[in-house]
């Protein structure tokens, strides 16, 4: 989809309070999209909403937010079902939530590895699983944010690389399975980016 095609479209943006997610949200707001921001921290969601409202193309735009930890499958399923009823079925789902904690492989605890996988990989799986049944009827777009570190291993980020490599594989398989519903799947693989995460 071209940016201009997002006018009056409904976009669910996960992890849109900083970095790449917020940059995408700003462009969508300026293009006239109705945006549902989803992230864990209410204060950051409020700040992002305030910024996006100043960029909105028209005063009929809906720019709202809800707190959500996408690593929680049940909470994600419940909230997404509620949002579909109150905000509408998304034309696009954009997954930008992620975490990266640099650490040598021998120092990465099971808990850190598990947490990284739950946010970076399972989080995307959880949002897709919750929304796909609703998106199948009208088609749409799913964007998962991986990384160049999902293509090339990076020193000191073994858990992050594992999650991002897996996300690319998941997204490519997803693309082949949902194309019959006219749902497109894109994977972003940005290099080092000047964001709070890096």
Features from the language model and the residues they span:
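Conserved glycine-rich cofactor-binding loop
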Residues: 10, 15-18
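Residue(s) in the substrate-gating loop at a strand-loop-helix junction
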Residues: 147
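The beta1-alpha1 cofactor-binding region of Rossmann-like NAD(H)/NADP(H)-dependent oxidoreductases
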Residues: 43, 67-78, 110
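Substrate-binding pocket helix/loop in short-chain dehydrogenase/reductase
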Residues: 104-105, 109-115
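Conserved NAD(P)H cofactor-binding loop of Rossmann-fold oxidoreductase domains
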Residues: 96-101
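Active-site helix of classical SDR
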Residues: 128, 163
């Amino acid at each position: 989809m071209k940016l201009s095609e997002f006018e009056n479209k409904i976009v669910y943006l996960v992890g849109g309070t900083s970095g790449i997610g917020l940059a995408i949200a700003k462009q969508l707001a300026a293009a006239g999209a109705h945006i549902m921001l989803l992230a864990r921290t209410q204060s950051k969601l409020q700040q992002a909403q305030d910024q996006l409202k100043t960029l909105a193309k028209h005063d009929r735009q809906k720019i709202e937010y809800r707190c959500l930890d996408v690593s929680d499958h049940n909470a994600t399923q419940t909230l997404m079902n509620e949002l579909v009823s109150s905000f509408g079925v998304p034309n696009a789902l954009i997954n930008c939530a992620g975490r990266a904690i640099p650490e040598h492989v021998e120092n990465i605890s099971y808990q850190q590895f598990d947490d990284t996988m739950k946010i970076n990989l399972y989080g995307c799986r959880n949002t897709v699983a919750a929304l796909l049944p609703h998106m199948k009827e009208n088609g749409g777009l799913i964007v998962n944010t991986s990384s160049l570190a999902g293509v090339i291993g990076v020193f000191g980020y073994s858990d992050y690389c594992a999650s991002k490599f897996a996300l690319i594989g998941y997204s490519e398989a997803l693309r082949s399975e949902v194309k019959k519903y006219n749902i497109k799947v894109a994977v972003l693989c940005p290099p080092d980016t000047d964001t709070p995460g890096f």
